[in-house]
Amino acid sequence: MRKRFFGLLLTAAMVACTMPMTVMAADGDSQDFKDENLVVGVWGGTIEEVLRKNVVDPMEEEYGCNIDLVLGGTSERKAKMYAEVDNPSMDVLFLNIYESAQAIADGVAQDVDPSLSNFDSLYDFAQTGGYGMSIMGLGIVYNDELVTDPITSWKDLWRDDLKGKVALSTFPSFEDDAFVDITAQAWGLDLKTQEDEVFDKIAELGSFPLFYSDLDELFLEMKQGTVKAAVMFNSYSNDYVEQGFPVKFVYPSDPGAVLAKDTIVIAKNTKHEALAKEFVNRCLSVETQTAYAEDIYFSLCNKNVKVDDETASKLVYGDDVDSLVSLDWTYILEHESEWTDKYNKLIEGN
């Protein structure tokens, strides 16, 4: 009986080898992805490298499909998604925490599909407004050789020893949008009724040595002491710590570090929905999420991922995830244009 059973298995395997590559897609349906072309809009650099190694190359080899990565920032691909809603040139798009939720609400992106096999492994915050790919904590990075009194709270940025030494990013950006809200919360101001007072408080930081858009430039200025502290993400900061820069990242209190989430959405009218969902499901896997953590220090959305203590120290991990502050991005985006004018005045008066 065992010989006959083995013979049946061998026959089945031989037949399978002569048939097109057919796989069980993320939604549970059998799919043939051979020669399909999936277009994914995503950031470049280390993110591209991790995705190619852990998702793109394995899928292309296994399924016989082709996956094109269109590199760039979120503003360009978001604009294309809205303009091309009826015939999207990109099937999958990586966006930030507020862009993805808005795209779903506006009907240009699909809502999440809970049937994906890795969906239930995501933290709750990663299951809404798009598929959560990674999270970061927005906090403070500072030169710990020049700043001898440790920074522990957001209000510490207003200390006399840091006056005129705090850098902000160019506006608009996630960092600056969030910093407006955080300034209000830290100083007990009502952002909705005391907006001018909030910007007056930001101006009290003194002359700004740098409005950064280039991280290499920022950390060089920090090394030289022109900048002593900056509003920054944990993952980027820890990358420069690894490179030997004399800096330290902290999750400041009052009210806490800000939750930043990179998300994935699928275009509403994609012609490759099953392949797109398979791509997303692979991105959410333990293997890919582990690579995000270990290779580029992006914190995890899959709660089943385990990393060593050294890696964990560089991430928002475990109980720290619950401590991140979520902001009212709907309100922030509604007022971003007027905030831009106020930021420009800060720069002009710099």
What are the language-model segments listed below?
Residues 323-350:
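Conserved C-terminal helix/tail region of periplasmic/extracytoplasmic solute-binding proteins
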Residues 28-102:
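Early extracytoplasmic/lumenal segment of secretory-pathway proteins
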Residues 1-38, 349-350:
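Short, low-complexity disordered leader/linker segments with a strong preference
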